[in-house]
Amino acid sequence: AAEGGLKYWKLAGTWLEEERAEYRLARSLLQAQNHASAVAHAERCVDVCIANNASPFERFFGYAVLAIAQLRGGDRPACAVSRQRALDQYAMVAADEKQWCEAEVNELRS
């Protein structure tokens, strides 16, 4: 379902929907324990954010899911870099948006 969502958001949506669909697919792949594919889609999520000068809120989620995927895939050094990038973005997230980041922040800090 997440793969289908990404396919159709690429056709019908903007970069924002594509980025969020990449995030959702990375999360689904983590649930399926397909860590390598999760990392690839998390990287794509981050790439879409960078290419479109996304807000810290969007970049936070990209780097967060990338760090989580890298950790679960056993790449601790890459995870440490992505984790720090996620937390750096989180520091710049608007106060009224921080509540939406709590689950990922907790996951990054555990």
Cite the ranges covered by each PLM segment:
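Amphipathic alpha-helical segments of tetratricopeptide repeats
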Residues: A2-K10, E43-A51, Q84-A95
